[in-house]
Amino acid sequence: MPYQPYITGVWYNKDLWEEAGLTEQDIPDTWEKLIRVCRKIKNSDSGLSAMTCDEEYVNLLYGYQLARYLGQEKVQQLIRNCTWSQIPQAKEAADDIRILFFAGYMSQSAPAQHPEGQDEVGDGEAVMVLQGSWVPNEVTEATESVDSWGFFPWPAVKAGTDGTEGVMVGAQGFGVTKDSQMKQEAFDFAYSICTGETDMKMTDAVNSIPADTDNTQWPEVLADAVPYMKEMSKPYMWAAGLEADPDYKEQIQSELLKLTRLEETSDEFIENLSNMK
């Protein structure tokens, strides 16, 4: 039974956004516009980092970018067939993500140990982070900040297969073991937690998306994501399919950390992934 649904995308500190001289008109829907926003933040007098990230979530950066070029199904095919060197968009996506770090758009501490990266948004050091809808609550509690949060989907790329209608969504869930002697009672208990007044109490307590579709009021910190959830027509799995093969997800993650730490070039990244099978 689905519980605590989530949506992923770029969450940003609205106060820092304004401090860097940005307005709602600057919210990017394309990769070029995102780079323009990052450049504007870097060149401002704010001293802010445009973006930040944590080590365990670098796969979201590359997964989203690759899926924008190819679509999620072809991302999975690429991994399954290990055709990294044969798909030019694989290197192009690597170039894109690497430039965020090489050009200084990412925080100097990124990729940081979790949750030090995402906490920079609450500490007034970085403006944006690609994360799930749990991040505003986590950061607010960790940093004791009272900032407002904004949201936009990971942007589209030129000549890409998917646009901002592709969004990584999911949920936690309750299950009943097959050996349970009280299956119906367990189901009824889980249902009582995920619906009605109890669902809203949990939503209010941790600023999460309601599980019950009859509970239409989202927490204020997540409100900017509501229209994008309604426009979503292509649901992505975790990291947009980048972890579809459990035998190789650790190798992919290892190479992504080297790429984002600027320890290898995009060419080396693709070469190493091509040799993983």
Model-derived features: positions:
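Extracytoplasmic/periplasmic substrate-recognition and gating elements
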Residues: 20-23, 103, 141-205
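Extracytoplasmic/periplasmic solute-binding protein
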Residues: 1-3, 8, 18, 32-82, ...
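C-terminal capping/gating helix-and-loop segments adjacent to ligand/active sites or protein-protein/ligand interfaces
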Residues: 206-216, 224-277
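Short helix-initiation/N-cap motifs at beta->coil->alpha
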Residues: 29-35, 108-123
